[in-house]
C-alpha cells in the first residue's frame, strides 16, 4: 500500500475528480467474479469432504466433547467445527450458544451496473471516503468490462429484504 499524490493519481486515473487530492493505492488488489469464486470454493470444499445441507434449518446447537451437535429440521448432525457464515442471520446462531446476545441490523445496498461503453472510464477500483454506514461508494470495473457503481446503504428490519427501489 502507498499514498498517491494528486499528480500521480491523475496520471493513473485521468477521469478522477479534480477535487481528489490523494489516494491510497493497493497495487496487489484485484477484481474477481464473486459468483464464479463462490462456486469454485464450494467445489473445492466438496472435494475435501464438506457435506452441504441445503434447505435445512438449524434449530439448536450443543457443544459436546468431540465438537458440536447441530439440531436441524432434517435431523441431528455431528461435527468437530462450526463456521458461522450465516450473514444477516449470524446473530441468531451466535445467540444460540452465547450468553452475550447480539442483534444484527440488516443493511441493504443497491448497485448500478453501467454499460460496457462506460467500462474504460476507470481502470481500477476507486473508493470514496468511508461514511457512517460503511466503506463508502465505489466504482469498479467488472470482469466482463462493465462498471459497477455503489452501493447505497439503508438500514432495514426485514432480514429477507432484497427488493430494489426506484431511487436505487
Model-derived segments and spans:
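Active-site substrate-recognition segment that forms the wall
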Residues: 60, 76, 81, 86-168
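Flavin (FAD/FMN) cofactor-binding and adjacent substrate-gating region
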Residues: 1-54, 60-66, 71
Amino acid at each position: 500500500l502507498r499514498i498517491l499524490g494528486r499528480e500521480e493519481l491523475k496520471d493513473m486515473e485521468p477521469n478522477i475528480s479534480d477535487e481528489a487530492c490523494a489516494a491510497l493505492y493497493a497495487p496487489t488488489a484485484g477484481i474477481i467474479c464473486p459468483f464464479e469464486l463462490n462456486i469454485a470454493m464450494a467445489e473445492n470444499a466438496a472435494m475435501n469432504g464438506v457435506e452441504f445441507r441445503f434447505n435445512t434449518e438449524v434449530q439448536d446447537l450443543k457443544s459436546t466433547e468431540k465438537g458440536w451437535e447441530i439440531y436441524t429440521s432434517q435431523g441431528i448432525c455431528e461435527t468437530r467445527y462450526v463456521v458461522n457464515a450465516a450473514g444477516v442471520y449470524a446473530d441468531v446462531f451466535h445467540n444460540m450458544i452465547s450468553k452475550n446476545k447480539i442483534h444484527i441490523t440488516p443493511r441493504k445496498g443497491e448497485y448500478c451496473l453501467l454499460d460496457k461503453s462506460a467500462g474504460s472510464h476507470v481502470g481500477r477500483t476507486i473508493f470514496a471516503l468511508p461514511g457512517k454506514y460503511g466503506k463508502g461508494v465505489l466504482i469498479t470495473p467488472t470482469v466482463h468490462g462493465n462498471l459497477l457503481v455503489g452501493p447505497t446503504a439503508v438500514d432495514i428490519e426485514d432480514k429477507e429484504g432484497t427488493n430494489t427501489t426506484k431511487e436505487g
